[in-house]
Amino acid sequence: MPLTTSTSGDGSASALPTARISRKPSEPAASASVPDASAPFTTFIERYRAKLRDLFERRVDADALNAQRGLPPFLLREIRDTDPLSVYVAEEHGGRGGHIHEGLAMLEATGYESLGLCLTFGINGALFLQPVGKYGSDDTKTDVLQRFLRDRRLGGLMITEPDHGTDALNMRTTFEADGERYRIHGTKHWGGLTGWADYWLLTAREQTAKGPGRDIGFFVCDVTQPEQHIEVEEVYENLGLRIIPYGRNQIDVSVPQAQRLEPDSTGIKMMLDLLHRSRMQFPGMSTGFLRRLLDETVDHCRERFVGGKPLEAYDNVKATLAKMQAYVTSSRAMSLFTSEHGGTDRDLSGMSLAANAIKTSVTDWMQQASQSFLQLCGAKGYRMDHLAGRATVDSRPFQIFEGANDILYQQVAEAVLKQMRRAKESNLYRFLQQDDLTARAADYFRETLSFDVDLSLPQRKLVALGEALSRVMSMEMTIELGERGYRADLIEQALTEMHADVQELVTRFRTDGVQGLIDDYRASSDWLQFVQARP
């Protein structure tokens, strides 16, 4: 039988054993002081970084902390006292204005110290505060956003269902009008901050006489209210990101009509706008994390001696460090791109190419950098209380949630091929030369990409092509960062590394001969029968 409890306003879940449920710090009283939102951003971010350093480098054992479930009661409370989530809220609701570059910088500072905490704030910002601020009714925005900052609330998003993850448009959670309220029924799982969040954005399809409708509705659910409690049926033993609780939730709530988000056109377009903006903000999380891994790896390679010389003196190690350094530079370039193209004043529902290329690239780099750090650390890194081991398991789900990377790569390729059909262009290089996301980077591949593409490719080819195209787009953003005056040596290094990656990916794309699964593969496949007796 699954353990069952309901979340309350303080996020407690008393029916669950403490070993199974994450600890949410008690919230300060409503009269708690809120930092001055009008302070210059340099003052704000330096104060925030200082608080993070004080907590993670002096007051807690960060390695042990991130290997445990939940957070110490004081930690999130003290961090929230610097009001980091105010960067996602408009000034009229007590925030700093909702500027994208401020949110990215806040996430970068957080990610350097703790990837789990960084994701916690990313969930609150991109998946709750930004959509509520953009699509919420005036009454909902005034009430929810002001209380969110004043009372140190937490918010999250529930889309995924046990049988509908990637297939979210066929979700089974439904809503129907009930007087001046909406009744919502269904099951959601893998929503980050399960049992913690005070507010949820719930997604559902309208129940009609013919079954669930095609469009998606979004509703703000305030679990502090009696008719809006969400039952937590099970808390999952997630492998990584252990400070964030995940689980399965039974939804049977009634919310006021005013708490339904108001799309500009359709709910599906609103969902795409929300998800694309969230994916475009992944560099905020990746940059700080990648910087930390680079710093730690460099320190280790300078201090660790093998064969009478430091690890950093070995050629293969130098190549690894250069690649990790390139990841940081390109992730920063993507932050620049997002800060100028990802604002809530824009409709991002049609920006799948940039959003998918950004999300897939930076999350692949996060995992690759983690694997490199772990490899160089050797056995001592293979522990949950060591940054190398923890980074490897913590970064892995970033390649899965908000769109599995292989599916997103396929979508990148399909989008480009669709545009090529419209332009009646079959040569990949010529097409990329004309596209704003690839024009300058395409010149690095005049020969490599100058071939006609079959516009009806099998899925495996689409995935390989999409990965290569995503790296070309990454190069374009890196070129732009360089032209703004960023360090030329770091730009050249990043472009060199990505150029090599694209060459390798294109080779894989153009290689034939990959077969599918051979049926009945267990028959006649025992190698022992082929052992020859010694003479």
Give the location of each predicted region.
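Glycine-rich phosphate/cofactor-binding loops in nucleotide/flavin-utilizing enzymes
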Residues: G9-D10, P17-R23, A379-E447, L457-P458, ...
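C-terminal helix-coil-helix/basic helical segment that borders enzyme active sites and/or dimer interfaces
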Residues: D63-A64, V328-S361, L374-Q375
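Glycine-rich phosphate/pyrophosphate-binding beta-alpha loops
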Residues: Y112, H189-G195, F398-F401
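A short core secondary-structure module
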Residues: H185-I230
